[in-house]
């Protein structure tokens, strides 16, 4: 990590009119539900308000704590979100990959704030293993190529502004999952490794001979379940 950048971000003795933006996502890997991209914007002189909240990466917080912080962050910062539905993810995965889908959403949110203020620094949780390449691709999509970009792995742990975006994204996705449960019952977290999610999908597919609309059909988990159904049909026909 660039310690000079980090120290400069957290140095609140010198106020300026600079705008700080944090970007992060939630729901990149699940087989069920949307991917949420969130951005939070704050004036550099107001960063202490976020620091006073004791922010952490959303994964390190309880559900109750995340929800409490969501409200406080929304009061302090300008918050914007993009919710990419499962069917939209499937549609885009036919022509591109998840990194580029995420990158496109990140840049759309960033450009919204750049239009309002060019004196801006953007902190972003890099979704690529190559931070520099990710940073270059992100900057290429911006309407102003001169803005400061800090793209790092685990930025949600290292910078409060990204922690805030992480919490906004996570709570937004969790709320969508809770709405799904009202219709479909227990579906778990939506992640392929979750036994509850696997149980729900397998039961649904076998009973309905297809996937629910809340599932990402382009995911290996979904494809394997559909393959099981097809093989079952063939077996019954041969039998």
UniProtKB/Swiss-Prot annotation:
Which is one Pfam family of this protein? RNase_HII
Q: Which reaction does it catalyse?
A: Endonucleolytic cleavage to 5'-phosphomonoester
Q: State the GO CC annotations.
A: cytoplasm; ribonuclease H2 complex
Question: What keywords sit in the KW lines?
Answer: Cytoplasm, Endonuclease, Hydrolase, Manganese, Metal-binding, Nuclease
Q: How is the cofactor bound?
A: Manganese or magnesium. Binds 1 divalent metal ion per monomer in the absence of substrate. May bind a second metal ion after substrate binding.
Kindly give the InterPro entries that the UniProt entry links to this protein. RNase_H2_suA, RNase_HII/HIII, RNase_HII/HIII_dom, RNase_HII_arc, RNase_HII_hlx-loop-hlx_cap_dom, RNaseH-like_sf, RNaseH_sf
Q: What is its EC number?
A: 3.1.26.4
MF terms from GO for this chain are: manganese ion binding; RNA binding; RNA-DNA hybrid ribonuclease activity
Cofactor(s) this protein requires:
Mn(2+); Mg(2+)
The record places domain RNase H type-2 at 18-231
Which GO BP terms sit in this record?
Answer: DNA replication, removal of RNA primer; mismatch repair
UniProt subcellular location: Cytoplasm
List residues binding a divalent metal cation.
24-25, 125
Classify the main location. cytoplasm
**Role summary:** Endonuclease that specifically degrades the RNA of RNA-DNA hybrids.
The UniProt entry's sequence similarity note says: Belongs to the RNase HII family.
Protein name per its UniProtKB record: Ribonuclease HII
Source organism per entry reads: Methanococcus maripaludis (strain C6 / ATCC BAA-1332)
Q: What is the lineage of its organism?
A: Archaea, Methanobacteriati, Methanobacteriota, Methanomada group, Methanococci
Gene (name only): rnhB
């Amino acid at each position: 990590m660039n310690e000079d950048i980090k120290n400069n971000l957290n140095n609140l003795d010198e106020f300026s009119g600079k705008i700080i933006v944090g970007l992060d996502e939630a729901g990149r890997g699940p087989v069920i539900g949307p991917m949420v991209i969130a951005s939070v914007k704050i004036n550099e002189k107001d960063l202490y308000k976020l620091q006073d909240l004791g922010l952490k990466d959303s994964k390190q917080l309880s559900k109750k704590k995340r929800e409490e912080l969501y409200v406080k962050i929304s009061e302090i910062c300008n918050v914007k979100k993009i919710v990419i539905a499962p069917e939209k993810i499937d549609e885009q995965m036919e022509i591109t990959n998840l990194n580029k889908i995420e990158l496109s959403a990140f840049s759309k949110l960033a450009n919204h704030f750049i239009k309002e203020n060019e004196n801006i620094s953007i902190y972003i949780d890099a979704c690529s293993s190559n931070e520099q390449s990710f940073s270059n691709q992100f900057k290429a999509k911006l309407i102003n190529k001169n803005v400061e970009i800090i793209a790092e792995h685990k930025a949600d742990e290292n910078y409060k502004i990204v922690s805030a975006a992480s919490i906004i994204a996570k709570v937004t996705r969790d709320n969508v999952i809770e709405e799904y449960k009202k219709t479909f019952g227990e579906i778990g977290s939506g992640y392929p490794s979750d036994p509850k999610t696997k149980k729900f999908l397998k039961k649904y597919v076998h009973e309905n001979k297809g996937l629910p609309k809340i599932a990402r059909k382009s995911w290996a988990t979904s494809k394997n379940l559909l393959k099981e159904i097809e093989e079952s049909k063939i077996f019954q026909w041969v039998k």
